[in-house]
């Protein structure tokens, strides 16, 4: 008889966003005339930039000709895309990378999960709380943890509370850990880390022979010129950090799917025999075995993001979303809501009014305002009493949602 992976049974409930979807569908069925505005899951709403769309069309046309037809591409990604990323995303930051250190994928969510393939099971993992659920759940799924306690913490994971007192930036763990998840600009709190704050983590990782998984999916939304866009802006980070980036929010690729992982050759691990070994070599081996590469049209579209015209158009969309964030942030502050984020990130993290639980506030907004957000407790126990709103909606919907909330909370 085929046996299941029992680790999946440790997961306490359904993935956060499907549970939100279930509740919204139930409400919509019971209230068919209600106009529900969704400011929950971080899905984009603006169309692809014209330059990106043209590259997409041209690439599809290539597939209709014998001369330009593209079949299997390099598993690591086409050099013309990798070089564009190096030249336009990293060189301006003063970061030098080799083409062999960048891997094109079909999205950073998969990468954040798949990277665990090349790390031993007995590594000690440190995760922020609240946190993007994928970091936590994928470690549970592969069997790195025990059962969850009454708070929802899994045995075998070191949780680093992120709260108002520490500015939602985790403090260095007191115990030695081997893998550290960091996400800045942060999802869900919308906060950012300074170079000095990141330097503490890089120094810790190098001193403890640990590896940082740095999720930079929202770096394009940074407005403060003093805030680093990449972990590699920090001295010593190329020895200890793997960086994940995504085209999903930056360029509206949530339905297109493209991301990248940077694995510097200097990031080393230790074999069971105590030998040093490059994670870059392991990730290349894993990639060539389990992945056939992102599609040719998608990579052509991604490369167009880095053209002068493509980036100008992409930046206009980013600015559109950040104006949405300002509208949400300022509107909530007008009625006395305590808010965080929304300045260098497209997420607004708010304190639930009156000490309500996160899910009670979710139900209140849904039933009384017909507005959908994301309960903070869905991101971890330290998210209880908080709530996330996304700036990725249509402008008119964002304005209407904010007015509904303001009227309800006055």
Curated annotation (Swiss-Prot):
Q: Where is the signal peptide?
A: none
GO MF terms, alphabetically ordered: L,L-diaminopimelate aminotransferase activity; pyridoxal phosphate binding
Note the superkingdom of the native organism: Bacteria
Q: What is its EC number?
A: 2.6.1.83
Q: What keyword terms does UniProt attach to this protein?
A: Aminotransferase, Pyridoxal phosphate, Transferase
For binding pyridoxal 5'-phosphate, which residues are annotated in this chain's numbering? 72, 108-109, 132, 187, 218, 246-248, 257, 292
- Obligatory cofactor(s): pyridoxal 5'-phosphate
Q: Which InterPro entries match?
A: Aminotransferase_I/II_large, DapL/ALD1, PyrdxlP-dep_Trfase, PyrdxlP-dep_Trfase_major, PyrdxlP-dep_Trfase_small
Q: Which reaction does it catalyse?
A: (2S,6S)-2,6-diaminopimelate + 2-oxoglutarate = (S)-2,3,4,5-tetrahydrodipicolinate + L-glutamate + H2O + H(+)
Give a GO biological-process term: lysine biosynthetic process via diaminopimelate
Q: Which SUPFAM superfamilies match?
A: PLP-dependent transferases (SSF53383)
Pathway(s) = Amino-acid biosynthesis; L-lysine biosynthesis via DAP pathway; LL-2,6-diaminopimelate from (S)-tetrahydrodipicolinate (aminotransferase route): step 1/1
Q: What's the short name of a Pfam family annotated to this entry?
A: Aminotran_1_2
Q: Report the function annotation for this chain.
A: Involved in the synthesis of meso-diaminopimelate (m-DAP or DL-DAP), required for both lysine and peptidoglycan biosynthesis. Catalyzes the direct conversion of tetrahydrodipicolinate to LL-diaminopimelate.
Q: Which family does it belong to?
A: Belongs to the class-I pyridoxal-phosphate-dependent aminotransferase family. LL-diaminopimelate aminotransferase subfamily.
The record's subunit annotation is: Homodimer.
Q: What is this protein called?
A: LL-diaminopimelate aminotransferase
What gene name does this entry carry?
Answer: dapL
């Amino acid at each position: 008889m085929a046996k299941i992976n029992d680790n999946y049974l440790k997961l306490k409930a359904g993935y956060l966003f499907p549970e939100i979807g279930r509740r919204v569908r139930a409400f919509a069925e019971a209230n068919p005339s209600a106009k529900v505005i969704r400011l929950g899951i971080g899905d984009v709403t603006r169309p692809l930039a014209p330059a990106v769309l043209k590259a997409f069309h041209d690439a599809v046309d290539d597939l209709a000709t014998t001369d330009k037809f593209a079949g299997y591409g390099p598993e690591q990604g086409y050099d013309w895309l990798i070089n564009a990323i190096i030249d336009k995303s990293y060189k301006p930051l003063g970061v030098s990378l080799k083409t062999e250190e960048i891997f094109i994928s079909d999205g950073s969510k998969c990468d954040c999960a798949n990277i665990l393939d090349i790390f031993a099971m007995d590594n000690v993992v440190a995760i922020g709380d609240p946190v993007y659920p994928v970091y936590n759940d994928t470690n549970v799924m592969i069997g790195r943890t025990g059962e969850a306690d009454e708070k929802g913490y899994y045995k075998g994971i070191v949780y680093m509370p992120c709260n108002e007192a520490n500015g939602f930036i985790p403090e260095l763990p007191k115990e030695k850990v081997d893998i550290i998840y960091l996400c800045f600009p942060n999802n869900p709190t919308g906060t950012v880390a300074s170079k000095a704050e990141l330097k503490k983590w890089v120094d810790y990782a190098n001193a403890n022979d640990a590896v940082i998984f740095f999720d930079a999916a929202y770096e394009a939304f940074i407005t403060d010129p003093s805030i680093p866009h990449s972990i590699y802006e920090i001295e010593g980070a190329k020895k200890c950090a793997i960086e994940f980036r995504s085209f999903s929010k930056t360029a509206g690729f949530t339905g297109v799917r493209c991301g990248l992982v940077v694995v510097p050759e200097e990031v080393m691990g230790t074999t069971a025999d105590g030998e040093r070994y490059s994670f870059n070599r392991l990730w290349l081996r894993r990639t060539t075995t389990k992945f056939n590469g992102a599609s040719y049209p998608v990579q052509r579209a991604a490369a167009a993001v880095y053209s002068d015209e493509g980036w100008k158009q992409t930046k206009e969309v980013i600015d559109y979303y950040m104006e949405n964030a300002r509208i949400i942030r300022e509107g909530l502050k007008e009625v006395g809501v305590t808010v965080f984020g929304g300045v260098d990130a497209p997420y607004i993290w708010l304190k639930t009014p009156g000490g309500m639980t996160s899910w009670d506030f979710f139900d209140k907004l849904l039933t009384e305002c017909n507005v959908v957000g994301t309960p903070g407790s869905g991101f971890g126990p330290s998210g209880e009493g908080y709530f996330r709103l996304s700036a990725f909606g249509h402008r008119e919907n964002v304005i209407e949602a904010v007015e509904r909330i303001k009227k309800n909370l006055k």
